[in-house]
């Protein structure tokens, strides 16, 4: 089972205003050795990804003063994970089903962010 978001998913969440993942590290790579053991460094940028736990922490406990019901289910067949939440507009549960839990949570966060819930 995948435990972390992809670099593309991570970049999208950061772009949407979420804090950088806790396991983000700033790295530098050696560009060239300029002699006498001195190395010139070049910034390689930031790496990191969100864990399943960090994605769950992004989800709100309350929407408009109402406690939010979140559900995570395992399913049979090719689609292994199903995440759902109360939709106060329709009064029904909405579901996202994916083979990886991290992908289902990521898509749920995008949907809620798009709707202005988080």
Question: Can you say where each PLM-predicted feature lies in the sequence?
Answer:
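Short amphipathic alpha-helical segments that mediate assembly, nucleic-acid/protein binding
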Residues: 7-9, 52, 102-105
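Extreme N-terminal leader/activation tails
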Residues: 1-33
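Non-transmembrane alpha-helical segments in soluble domains
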Residues: 10-14, 60, 109
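N-terminal segment of the canonical double-stranded RNA-binding domain
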Residues: 19, 29-99
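Ampiphathic alpha-helical segments that act as solvent-exposed interaction surfaces
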Residues: 94-118
